[in-house]
């Protein structure tokens, strides 16, 4: 009888284990919140917060708000699901910061672009060229910068393609493809 109970219990446990879905899955979206142990990701399916406590974050690139992200997990997609890996596009993290060049009018000054999280941008000391937003272009190192030019009398909206590069000394540059302007990323 005891042996029969043990067999029934073993079969029941095997059945429960077989029913749990531990196949690896991924959830891709945009980071809307992040902390030391969680990341909240939103896409068309909804918004979910994942535990990142034991996740591989070697490709997380700072988990910046607005960054495109892929979260790998197992089991059911639910609030608090444990992530096994979190990866973002490195171009997003490389882009965020102040990009400047010497100001040709003021030899002691600089001008440039401040690229911020969540797709926001601002001009630095450029009154007639106002950057407002940016987005990844989908190719490594490529961005689209958007704003308004007021230099010719009436405001004209613009979109520029820019390329991020890193030289052998680790210095990042941002080159505007339409005019060849080269900005250097400020150390922060």
Predicted regions and their residues:
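Bacterial N-terminal signal peptides that target proteins for export
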Residues: 1-7
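C-terminal motif of bacterial Sec signal peptides marking the signal peptidase cleavage site
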Residues: 15-18
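Structural detector for short beta-strands of small beta-barrel domains
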Residues: 20-37
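Contiguous, well-ordered beta-strand patches that form the walls/edges
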Residues: 32-39, 43-46, 54-57, 105-111, ...
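Short, charged beta-turn/beta-strand-edge "cap" motif at the junction between a beta-strand
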Residues: 33-34, 72-79
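Short nucleic-acid-contacting surface segments enriched for D/E, G, S/T with interspersed K/R
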Residues: 57-72
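Edge beta-strand at a domain terminus
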Residues: 79-93, 132-138, 175-188
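Tryptophan-anchored aromatic micro-motifs
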Residues: 91-108
């Amino acid at each position: 009888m005891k042996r029969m109970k043990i067999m029934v219990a073993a079969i029941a446990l095997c059945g429960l284990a077989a029913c749990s879905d531990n196949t690896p899955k991924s959830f891709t979206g945009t980071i809307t919140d992040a902390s030391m142990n969680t990341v909240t990701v939103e896409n068309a399916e909804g918004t979910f917060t994942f535990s990142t406590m034991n996740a591989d974050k070697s490709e997380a690139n700072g988990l910046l708000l607005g960054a495109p992200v892929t979260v790998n997990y197992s089991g059911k997609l639910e609030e608090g699901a444990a992530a096994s890996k979190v990866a973002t596009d490195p171009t997003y993290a490389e882009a965020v910061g102040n990009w400047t060049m010497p100001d040709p009018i003021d030899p002691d000054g600089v001008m440039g672009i401040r690229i911020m999280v969540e797709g926001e941008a601002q001009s630095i000391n450029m009154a007639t060229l106002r950057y407002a937003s940016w987005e990844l272009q989908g190719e490594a190192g490529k961005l689209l910068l958007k704003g308004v030019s007021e230099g010719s009398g009436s405001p004209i909206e613009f979109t520029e393609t820019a390329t991020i590069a890193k030289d052998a000394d680790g210095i990042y540059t941002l080159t505007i493809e339409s005019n060849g302007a080269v900005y250097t990323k400020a150390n922060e």
